[in-house]
Regions:
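N-terminal secretory signal peptides that target proteins for export/translocation
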Residues: 1-5
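Solvent-exposed, well-ordered loop and adjacent helix/strand elements within mature globular domains
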Residues: 23-164
Length: 164
């Protein structure tokens, strides 16, 4: 089991390095560093289980927690901090209800914690923006799913606008 995860991680890291040598993503100066966003909550008991769209185990309670978003708005790998509680998150998942919405879905380990969070508008600070090329690479493997196609179209548009 561990060797399969290690192989997935090696493939992802290799693909990431290839993708990073491609065109630049949206220029950092054009992206906000602080914003107020709508957040919702999800847990591993929902469809998809305890693994993210990147293949990593969903995380909570450590240095960095897992989050999901529409990758055409907030690309995979984006790290942010919720200012009210100082928790840091990384976008490594997506969900059908997030496509076309500027909402972040935060991972919680239990249904009780998920319901306690509910829906909140919070101020976040972007620690590091993620990668549209890596988002594209990961989404392109799942284009048979309609909401993934919609997200991929948005990612492709971002890439087309910012690549020469």
């Amino acid at each position: 089991m561990r060797s399969i995860r290690e192989a997935r991680r090696a493939i992802l890291l290799g693909a990431l390095s290839v993708a990073m040598t491609g065109c630049a993503t949206v220029k950092p100066a054009e992206r906000p560093r602080r914003m107020t966003v709508r957040t919702t909550a999800y847990t591993g008991g929902e469809p998809g289980g305890n693994f993210s769209a990147t293949g990593t185990r969903l995380r909570f309670g450590g240095a960095v927690n897992s989050a999901a978003a529409d990758w055409s708005w907030m690309p995979v790998g984006t790290r942010f901090r919720i200012l009210s509680n100082s928790r840091e998150y990384v976008v490594e998942d997506f969900g059908s209800a997030l496509v076309g919405r500027e909402t972040i879905d935060l991972f919680f380990p239990t249904f009780a914690a998920m319901h306690e969070w509910g829906t909140r508008n919070v101020e976040i600070e972007i620690v590091e923006w993620g990668s549209y090329p890596v988002s594209k690479m990961l989404l392109d493997r799942r284009l048979d799913v309609s909401y993934v196609r919609r997200m991929a179209e948005g990612v492709n548009l971002k890439l087309a606008l910012h690549c020469q």
